[in-house]
Amino acid sequence: MVTGADGFIGSHLTEALVRAGYDVRAFVLYNSFGSWGWLDRCEADVRNKFEVFAGDIRDPNGVRAAVKGCDAVLHLAALIAIPYSYHSPDTYVDTNIKGTLNIVQAARELGVQRVIHTSTSEVYGTARYVPITEDHPLQGQSPYSASKIGADQIAMSFYTSFATPVVILRPFNTYGPRQSARAVIPTIITQIAHGLRRIKLGALHPTRDFNYVSDTVAGFICALRSQTGIGEVVNLGSNFEISIGDAARAIAEVMGVEIELLSDKQRLRPDKSEVERLWADNSKARKLLDWQPQYGGLDGFRRGLSATVEWFKEPANLRSYRSDIYNL
């Protein structure tokens, strides 16, 4: 079962698992419109080849019903927008921490063979050293990252306390088709695609390690198949660092335009909350999971950007995004 299957990474993962021959149950957030999120637009060769369970990760009864009969759970469902976490932190505790507790509790009771829990590089806070290894100190610099630290600890506690077979994957900044406009790369692409040349962003100097979505998905599948990852925390990162400003300029180059970058006050994090530097050491993933990024380095980043830009430029896709508002 894939939780968060209606979201950005989850929809790509669901498609990849179906294509790899797995029987997949897709856990999507219940809504009165009957929408399956991005799964509504999945590729024709995948559509109708997975089972959908509509529920809420915060509800233990629904989660247990969804987990029943599954050999493995890939848990991606979460609230992830950092700005929204500043004014609605309770929802992050309920969804990210309690939701994870519901998953591992159901997995323990039902004898699930593998739980792959999704962490985030944000739990490291500003890097104290680079590249960042999995034993780097955890620093909750936003309510979001604090909630994910709590979720990680809950998941790992079930491994240490009850031998629940948990693997924690810690992706660095994933990007690609279908990503929310609240993320920096879609924000830049959609502003340019809508004809803007003065691009509004938050801070331009922080650095990030960007993962193309197919690399992140491959990491999940490697963790599902591997016999050596249980009880481990594993970074998924490209081992390539670039500033937000330079990433924006790389996007403009791919799109063949010249831009001016503006630091918009409302997009800035509080001073002590900004994560200044993230750069992954991915050697553990290479060794334990036999995983390696296909879009690493500057050349790989540009290839990933090109594929992402092409998707966003499709009119049917671009219509789903608004560049005239600040997306929390």
Regions found by a protein language model. Name each.
Residues V73, T216, F220, L236, ...:
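Non-catalytic, hydrophobic alpha-helical segments
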Residues V213, V233, L268-G296, R303, ...:
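Conserved C-terminal active-site "lid" loop/helix of NAD(P)H-dependent oxidoreductases
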Residues I149, T174-T187, H194-I199, V213-S214, ...:
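Glycine/proline-rich active-site loop of Rossmann-fold NAD(P)-dependent oxidoreductases
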Residues A203, G231-V234, S243-A248, G256-R277, ...:
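C-terminal "lid/loop" region of Rossmann-like NAD(P)-dependent oxidoreductases
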